[in-house]
Amino acid sequence: MKLTLISSCVALAFMALATEAAPSGKKLSIPLTKNTNYKPSAKNAIQKALAKYHRFRTTSSSNSTSTEGTGSVPVTDYYNDIEYYGKVTVGTPGVTLKLDFDTGSSDLWFASTLCTNCGSSQTKYNPNQSSTYAKDGRTWSISYGDGSSASGILGTDTVTLGGLKITKQTIELAKREATSFQSGPSYGLLGLGFDTITTVRGVKTPVDNLISQGLISKPIFGVYLGKESNGGGGEYIFGGYDSSKYSGSLTTIPVDNSNGWYGITIKGTTIGSSKVSSSFSAILDTGTTLLILPNNVASAVARSYGASDNGDGTYTIDCDTSSFKPLVFSIGSSTFEVPADSLVFEQDGSTCYAGFGYGDYDFAIFGDVFLKNNYVVFNQEVPEVQIAPIA
């Protein structure tokens, strides 16, 4: 699931961005990191996503029971759009950690010096070296459907996101993690979902605390995930959004957060002049790589593109997409596309694997294949999202 980090760093100079929020916001530039030896795997991406949603809710814990501003955190495109991560500072003095920003979960956990089997290449948080760390006393454990897991203890410390300093944030210190987590480019996960699905009940997420501590002017965050073909990278803006990153106007869509996710309704799907599906539910998930559709929808889409079912959730598709029409979803009062150049995710010699797949769920998971083509503003308070095509 996670990838071996054999990387070269390419520093990018980021242009100053015009953000829609208070002018006191801070911005952080992050280099683009690529693993030139990595081979994208559609099969692994499908398995990772399905394992993630299978585990809800197979979690356990020992006790389950104003300055306005914006902060922006650029994110790194980890080789061919396989994973985006941002840098977060934890503790005093701070240690900088690469974390997977994930709207499909709500936990903030990362490798620590208490971990007996964490990857040797991972930067580890040391609670004994932070003057602002405090013990919590509770434990946490996450088990995924594919058998991978992470577990450890809870504490509180100062967490800084894009220049915004959250005090007394509950953090989950990993004491053990499965081998699938040990070699990836990120050292943990920062969940941006709703607090109803935190592993330990009652824990407030970083977004909760950004709002309650008055660190952001609006209860929103804008997400831009850049394509590797356009230089990669991307950015999260907490408390605002970047109007230069999208074209046209934002379409507002209500969110169903009853399961702790950013759930929306897809009214229909078209390819060219052909309607290929009626309505279905979907989750907007920055922590999932592919576009995972309900089985019947995926089958109809695959037929339209002449793709072949591999029996493992993936499809083989023609490597030449020049004649393909975009995959178009009707959402709210607008339509949003996955263009032809995003329909191929992985190429193995003369064989190509599609950027869409399927699972055993009756809902879709709109991962990075959709999100890197459409700018999204997440509003936790209403709740709602606003979407527009990328510029």
UniProtKB/Swiss-Prot annotation:
Matches recorded under PROSITE patterns: ASP_PROTEASE, PEPTIDASE_A1
CDD domains: Aspergillopepsin_like (cd06097)
Gene Ontology BP, a term: proteolysis
Disulfide bonds: 115-118, 319-352
GO terms assigned for molecular function: aspartic-type endopeptidase activity
Root EC class: hydrolase
Keywords: Aspartyl protease, Disulfide bond, Hydrolase, Protease, Signal, Zymogen
Propeptide span(s): 22-68
Catalytic residues (UniProt): 102, 285
Enzyme Commission code: 3.4.23.21
Catalytic activity: Hydrolysis of proteins with broad specificity similar to that of pepsin A, preferring hydrophobic residues at P1 and P1'. Clots milk and activates trypsinogen. Does not cleave 4-Gln-|-His-5, but does cleave 10-His-|-Leu-11 and 12-Val-|-Glu-13 in B chain of insulin
Domain Peptidase A1: 84-388
Residues annotated as signal peptide: 1-21
Domain of life: Eukaryota
Protein family (similarity comment): Belongs to the peptidase A1 family.
Listed name of the protein: Rhizopuspepsin-2
